[in-house]
């Protein structure tokens, strides 16, 4: 496979609203991010993926953009962004922007114009359809956030498509003028010096000409647009054009958010010779159906996690590049979702999960606070939630649905995206050192124990463990490029694999359970070098090993 800087990089996702507030208004901002660059440099990350900081009415926390070339005032100014970029580059840290071009805000000038009349020059920047004969929506598709995917606009008595909120109308990528404007905007950011893009729901940008009803829609309910709009008819054509017009002219890292992507489809988006993206995010290991739609209260079975991650490791090797993640701004906290967040096991299981992920082939992503072992938040009441998806879920299942508050609330507690969006826990001062004002969302009360200052004062903390994992990746090519082989594929507790490159071989052993387990290692690993251990193990002389609860051990021979 071809070498590229992003194959050896570790990415840190910053959700600016919750990272660091410099001006005391309770909302994280760009100056706040800049003020914490030394912390990120100490951790050792190479890239910051910055969640959206563009001008936005904030219906979906910045994923509804009203001006792609302006900064949201609550985050600061363009001068603040330029300073962040300069200071990051000075520290050898690259900046990747979130790019949201499946849809815009309904307050974007394009849409303000588009809705004025049927013959407006911007009409075809969006997807408009006539009502059915009875005046109802053009088809039965539902939106990702609940309700119909169509909104009637009284100005022209036509419907526009919105796969997300009604305030997020979908852009019409069939229109070459729209594509030209998007490429111009991307070029403007590249010329400014940004180092790449994370492309939001990029697999949805191509819509079919025909938009039939989903025949499998529940009676009286909404259908699924996925079969028609995900990996749509022209998506690869558009991305190849984007690559030729913009991406290939710069040394960028690009990652596409591609829900529902298959191995075969991923190779089209991010194959070595596809000329589209550097890599994609697949969500097969985290998007598991729950009892009520996506809402669940139980962890994803470890055997399922192992099977899915191993499939992607094995089948993309040598063909395309993996993105490695367990958490992001849309997922519960990693240690709560996959590990054991009880105080006695939180640190060890957080280290174990990090080991399991960071020893794989691909580019690892750390979500802010993951390096501290931050946990899900014990929200007390509905009014503490801020996330549109959570509030819509409550309305769907409780207000308009069959469940009581007490029946559904545990599902919100476990799965809400707000778990990832509580403020970064910097120290044990009020509001976890995130703000001197009133935070926009509540702070997790465990900040008095779980915080960056405490972690940096403790040589055995998760912070320094992540730092070591990052350093190991830079020191050992086998971690970056080695071939993956899963051992014990049917064991429900042990996630064990090898990585092999030339004469170097790693053995990665992770115990996902609270029970100790004996295991016999392959020959040649007894007495091998201990690369990293979350239990303080310095050697393993015997071929049979007793793995402690949530133990992770990596040997190199």
Place the predicted regions along the sequence by residue:
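Active-site and adjacent substrate-binding regions of carbohydrate-active enzymes
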Residues: 1-557
């Amino acid at each position: 496979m071809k070498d590229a800087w992003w194959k050896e990089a570790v990415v840190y996702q910053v959700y600016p609203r919750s990272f660091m507030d410099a001006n005391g208004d309770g909302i994280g901002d760009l100056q706040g991010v800049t003020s914490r660059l030394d912390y990120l440099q100490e951790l050792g990350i190479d890239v910051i993926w910055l969640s959206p900081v563009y001008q936005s009415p904030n219906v979906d926390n910045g994923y509804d953009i009203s001006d792609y070339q302006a900064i949201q005032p609550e985050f600061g100014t363009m001068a603040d962004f330029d300073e962040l970029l300069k200071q990051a580059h000075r520290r050898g840290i690259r900046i990747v922007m979130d790019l949201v071009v499946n849809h815009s805000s309904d307050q974007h000038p394009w849409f303000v114009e588009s809705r004025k009349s049927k013959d407006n020059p911007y009409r075809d920047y969006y997807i408009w359809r006539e009502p059915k004969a009875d005046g109802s929506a053009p088809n039965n598709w539902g939106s990702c956030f609940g309700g119909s995917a169509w909104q009637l606009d009284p100005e022209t008595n036509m419907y526009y498509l919105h796969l997300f909120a009604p305030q997020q109308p979908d852009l019409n990528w069939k229109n070459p003028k729209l594509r030209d404007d998007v490429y111009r905007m991307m070029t403007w950011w590249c010329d400014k010096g940004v180092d790449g893009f994370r492309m939001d729901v990029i697999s949805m940008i191509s819509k079919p000409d025909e938009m039939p009803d989903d025949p499998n829609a529940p009676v009286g309910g909404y259908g699924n647009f996925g079969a028609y709009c995900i990996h749509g008819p022209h998506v690869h054509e558009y991305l190849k054009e984007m690559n030729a017009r913009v991406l290939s002219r710069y040394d960028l890292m690009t990652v596409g958010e591609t829900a529902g992507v298959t191995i075969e489809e991923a190779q089209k988006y991010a194959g070595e010779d596809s000329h589209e993206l550097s890599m994609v995010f697949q969500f097969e290991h985290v998007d598991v159906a729950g009892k009520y739609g996506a809402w669940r209260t139980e962890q994803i079975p470890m055997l399922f996690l192992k099977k899915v991650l191993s499939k992607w490791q094995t089948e993309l090797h040598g063909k395309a590049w993996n993105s490695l993640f367990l958490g992001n701004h849309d997922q519960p906290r990693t240690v709560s979702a996959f590990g054991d967040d009880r105080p006695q096991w939180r640190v060890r299981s957080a280290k174990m999960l990090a080991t399991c992920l960071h020893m794989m082939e691909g580019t690892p992503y750390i979500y802010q606070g993951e390096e501290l072992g931050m946990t899900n938040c014990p929200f007390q009441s509905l009014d503490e939630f801020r996330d549109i998806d959570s509030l819509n879920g409550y309305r769907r299942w409780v207000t308009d649905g069959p469940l009581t508050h007490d029946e559904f609330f545990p599902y919100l507690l476990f799965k809400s995206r707000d778990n990832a969006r509580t403020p970064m826990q910097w120290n044990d001062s009020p509001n976890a050192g995130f703000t001197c004002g009133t935070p926009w969302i509540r702070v997790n009360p465990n900040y008095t124990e779980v915080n960056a200052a405490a972690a940096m004062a403790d040589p055995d903390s998760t912070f320094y463990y992540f730092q070591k994992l990052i350093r190991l990746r830079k020191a050992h090519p086998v971690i970056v490029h080695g071939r993956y082989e899963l051992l014990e594929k049917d064991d429900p507790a042990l996630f064990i694999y090898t990585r092999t490159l030339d004469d170097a071989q790693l053995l990665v052993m992770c115990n996902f359970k609270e029970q100790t387990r004996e295991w016999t290692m392959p020959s040649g690993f007894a007495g091998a070098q201990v690369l990293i251990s979350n239990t303080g193990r310095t050697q393993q002389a015997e071929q049979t090993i007793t793995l402690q609860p949530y133990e992770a051990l990596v040997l190199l021979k």
